[in-house]
Amino acid sequence: MPTNITIPALDGEGEIPAYRAAPEVAPRAAIIVIPEIFGVNDGIKVKCCAWAEHGYLAIAPDIFWRFAPGSELDPDIEPEFQQAIANMMKYDADDGVKDIEACARYVRSKEGVPKVGVVGFCLGGRLAYMAATRTDVDASVGYYGVMIDQMLGEAKAISNPLMLHIPTADHFVTPDAQLAIHQGLDPHPKVTLHDYQGLDHGFASSSGSRRNEEGARLADSRTREFFAEHLG
């Protein structure tokens, strides 16, 4: 049964609101689900419940809790889309990494689940990459992560498996940025990159106008196989 919980932030900063979905039996592992700039909306909750159905404990933290708590926005509604952009402009990704670390510690110590993965979308895809470079999570997956090309210098710190889903027509990630990601990460033994020809940002959304059914199903199947291999 999904519930809303709070997770202690690092350094006593406060409490991170989070959405929690758990399987009916002991979880095989935990997955931290990092949302797009639209917050823990219905689409992210659907993804959490899907992971629970596959036997994982899923935790989706409210990444904007410091200045816009409770944001649940719809990308297909223009004023809400613009609010999401405004939230992103205020956001400090370093705080996001701290929140991922806080969630991982919570899952391991309070939930008693030792293996932890991260899956993120858009801004969350960038944070999934940063989690792979800066934390000890066991595996990470990023969908259409933004600004990863600006952080390739951190790739040498990746010690656990990372998978990135890259739509080639992503209007937020230029072809030059995609080329840089491939040049920087293709040689890395822990990194797997998948391109999706002609697809755009948000293609794996749970619903809405951005979703591409075939591409979403393919990417999600690859993610499930990846986590099954590296988390159990």
Where is each model-derived feature located?
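N-terminal cap/leader regions of alpha/beta-hydrolase-fold enzymes
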Residues: 1-232
